[in-house]
């Protein structure tokens, strides 16, 4: 790589490149690809260090923005506290994941690049150098190309890699900092607020892609839910270790006591050992029940079985309700630091991601919708649609052809 770079600068690249065999050319292209990827990782790590030093010296961009708002509030009457609360209540950022075959990267490669990034952030040492060399060697011997063109679910797995990383590390801390900073403005960010959420087109964007069917969309959503559950369980493992609060030493709310009893009754599969050793630790029992209900919810979606109240979660609101029960009990019983710490960070992350990990946008060309509506109602105008929505008559779906039926299956 270095020889070719030097030759290019000297205008002598043809002397090297013209003598390469096909195999050597492929190796050279791969080497340059890895070189640029590794250079990008090194630059990102260095940039991260610069930003961290800047944050430690002058505060984050968010804290500086809050400082500017506070300064403006002192000299301006254009907005008041009520305006600030309204703005924050309605504040919403929603990044959307998309996919393109040219941007697809194997998770094996992404994982190794992440390892290299983490190693570069460690102090220089012989161990660090050896592990960097080992990981780069593994990267070189890993085929960065899949055997075939990525299928929609392959692309979904690729985006989920980033969603998992965001849920596990970044988003809980970002939202905690956001809540802390806006509090300086006298604004409370409710735990159900969604200043940050995520969307995806992957598995739902069927506009011009015949491979995206209703089954593919459903599989992508199930995949997202299973990964959300898996990553959230890591947070719950941390939480269950932390909330070792004993009723011998502090009280708990009647609501929490009743909730735990209901959970234990409706979830008989919770091991008797957990019931016994955590008998005086209701928060641990509650988190254990949440864990079981999440796994049952995941299985319910996979099996397409009906919701069973008390055994699984109908939606994200029910999951958040369980966390709210714990929060209120902690706040009323000298557990404010715990309630506003790990528990709050997990709660805000759940509000951001929801059970589906990211909200899927279903995208389809309007012609497909009009085609379906014309087969159903012989018309696709807004007037006829409104009329049919108010009608109670049964619609005959057997007359739909394959094209119309494909569109219909997306929604029913």
Residue ranges and their predicted role:
Residues 395-412:
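C-terminal amphipathic alpha-helical interaction region
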């Amino acid at each position: 790589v270095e020889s070719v770079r030097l030759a290019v600068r000297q205008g002598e690249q043809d002397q090297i490149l013209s003598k390469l065999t096909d195999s050597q050319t492929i190796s050279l292209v791969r080497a340059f690809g890895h070189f640029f990827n590794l250079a990008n990782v090194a630059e990102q790590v260095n940039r991260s260090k610069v930003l961290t030093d800047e944050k430690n010296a002058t505060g984050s961009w968010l804290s500086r923005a809050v400082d500017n708002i506070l300064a403006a509030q002192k000299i301006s009457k254009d907005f008041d506290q009520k305006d600030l609360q309204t703005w924050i209540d309605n504040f919403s950022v929603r990044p959307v994941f998309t996919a393109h075959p040219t941007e697809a990267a194997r998770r094996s490669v992404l994982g190794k690049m992440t390892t290299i990034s983490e190693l570069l952030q460690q102090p220089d040492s012989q161990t660090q150098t050896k592990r960097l060399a080992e990981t780069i060697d593994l990267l070189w011997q890993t085929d960065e190309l899949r055997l075939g063109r990525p299928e929609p679910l392959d692309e979904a797995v690729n985006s989920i890699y980033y969603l998992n990383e965001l849920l596990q590390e970044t988003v809980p801390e970002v939202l905690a900092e956001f809540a802390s900073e806006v509090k300086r403005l006298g604004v409370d960010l409710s735990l159900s607020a969604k200043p940050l959420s995520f969307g995806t087109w992957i598995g739902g964007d069927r506009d011009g892609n015949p491979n995206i069917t209703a089954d593919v969309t459903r599989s992508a959503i199930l995949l997202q839910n299973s990964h959300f559950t898996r990553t959230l369980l890591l947070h719950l493992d941390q939480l269950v270790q932390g909330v070792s609060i004993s009723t011998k030493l502090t009280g708990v709310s009647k609501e929490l006591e009743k909730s735990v009893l209901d959970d234990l009754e409706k979830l008989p599969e919770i091991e008797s050992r957990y019931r016994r050793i955590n008998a005086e630790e209701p928060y641990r029992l509650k988190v254990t029940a949440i864990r079981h209900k999440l796994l049952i919810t995941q299985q319910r979606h996979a099996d397409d079985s009906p919701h069973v109240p008390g055994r699984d979660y109908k939606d994200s609101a029910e999951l958040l309700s369980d966390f709210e029960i714990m929060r209120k009990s902690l706040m009323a019983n000298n557990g404010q630091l715990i309630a506003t710490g790990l528990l709050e960070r997990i709660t805000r992350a759940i509000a951001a991601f929801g059970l589906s990990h990211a909200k899927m946008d279903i995208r389809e060309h309007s012609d497909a919708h009009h085609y379906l509506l014309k087969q159903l109602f012989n018309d696709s105008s807004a007037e006829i649609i409104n009329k049919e929505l108010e009608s109670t008559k049964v619609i005959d779906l057997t007359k739909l052809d394959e094209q119309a039926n494909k569109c219909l299956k997306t929604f029913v």
